């Protein structure tokens, strides 16, 4: 931290700690504007979460991954995220059917998905703590929030690697489903849950498909935003120039002679333009 080796608190939990530090930084001088980059580790392997968050999802995923994907696809249509004419992509034939799993397998994967969902909700709750702090310090109304993800759901299970298992056991990690999400646990939802979690997209992380490359982008704050859902194509490299325009900072910034890439998507947010990319650009 600031060029010095940092230490973690005894009761460290990444989502809570990241927000605690951001509040600490902002609190140092409330008279100054701020830019905060919160690089949450949720949801990422090893997938750990306070048990009360995991337990909130008891029974939610007992219907299996096919049912979850079907339900989410229907809901996506209901809230107009996709068109009424859209057709669901079938689960790949090499994937397992939930009905073919035995009792122990179902228990393992249900607990894994509960931990995954709980970790995501916990991150959301900590973002809520930051929002509450900004409201208390009268900084909320002048703050723009941008929330996105780097890729679609992760499907790999690290314990499938013999080399990783050597490291896991040497460092005291376990994959006991009864303790999924607890300290020193390591959990993976597998390809079937990942496929369902990416709904309505196809596939997941590591693939050149919508389930991997198309992620949510949530932006709020500071009145110029046009409310609602927008399907415009944007890239993560467009975030930085957009922030600069929102803050009225010159965008012709160079680093070692290299200009910043990306385009400002403010015209899309304000309703001035439908897209910042042409139909043939990607």
Describe each PLM feature range:
Residues 48-49, 132-220:
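Histidine-centered active-site microenvironments of extracellular/periplasmic hydrolases
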Residues 34-39, 144-148, 200, 217-219, ...:
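Structural recognition of the beta-strand scaffold that forms the well-ordered cores
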Residues 183-210, 224-232, 236-282:
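C-terminal cap/loop subdomain of S1 sulfatases and analogous C-terminal strand-loop tails that border
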Residues 15-94, 119, 123, 128, ...:
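Active-site regions of oxyanion-processing enzymes, predominantly non-cytosolic
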Residues 1-7, 95-112, 216, 220-225:
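Short glycine/proline-rich turn/loop motifs
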Residues 7-15, 105-121, 187:
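Short acidic-aromatic active-site loops that bind/stabilize oxyanions
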Residues 1-10, 42-51, 272, 279:
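Catalytic-site neighborhoods of secreted/periplasmic enzymes
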Residues 16-20, 70, 114, 121-128, ...:
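A structural signal for well-ordered alpha-helical segments within the folded catalytic domains
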């Amino acid at each position: 931290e600031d060029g010095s080796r940092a230490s973690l608190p005894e009761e460290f939990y990444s989502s809570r700690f990241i927000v605690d530090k951001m509040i600490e930084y902002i609190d140092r001088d409330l008279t100054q504007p701020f830019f905060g980059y919160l690089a949450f580790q949720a949801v990422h392997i090893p997938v750990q979460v306070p048990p009360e968050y995991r337990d909130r999802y008891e029974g939610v995923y007992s219907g299996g991954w096919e049912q979850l994907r079907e339900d989410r696809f229907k809901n996506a249509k209901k809230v107009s995220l996709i068109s009424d004419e859209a057709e669901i992509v079938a689960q790949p034939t090499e994937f397992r059917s939930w009905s073919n799993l035995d009792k122990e397998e179902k228990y393992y994967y249900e607990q894994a998905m509960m931990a995954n969902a709980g970790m995501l909700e916990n991150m959301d709750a900590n973002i809520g703590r930051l929002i509450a702090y900004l409201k208390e310090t009268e900084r909320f109304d002048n703050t723009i929030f941008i929330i996105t993800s780097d890729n679609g759901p992760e499907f790999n299970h690290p314990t499938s690697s013999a080399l990783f298992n050597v490291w896991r056991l040497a460092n005291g990690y376990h994959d006991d489903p009864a303790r999924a999400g607890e300290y020193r646990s390591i959990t993976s939802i597998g390809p079937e849950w990942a496929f369902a979690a990416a709904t309505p997209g196809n596939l997941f992380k590591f693939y050149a498909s919508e389930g991997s490359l198309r992620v949510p982008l949530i932006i709020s704050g500071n009145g110029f935003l046009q409310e609602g859902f927008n399907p415009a194509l944007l890239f993560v490299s467009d975030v930085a120039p957009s922030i600069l325009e929102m803050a009225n900072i010159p965008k012709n910034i160079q680093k070692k002679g290299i200009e910043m890439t990306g385009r400002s998507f403010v015209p899309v947010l304000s309703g001035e333009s439908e897209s910042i990319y042409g139909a043939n650009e990607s």
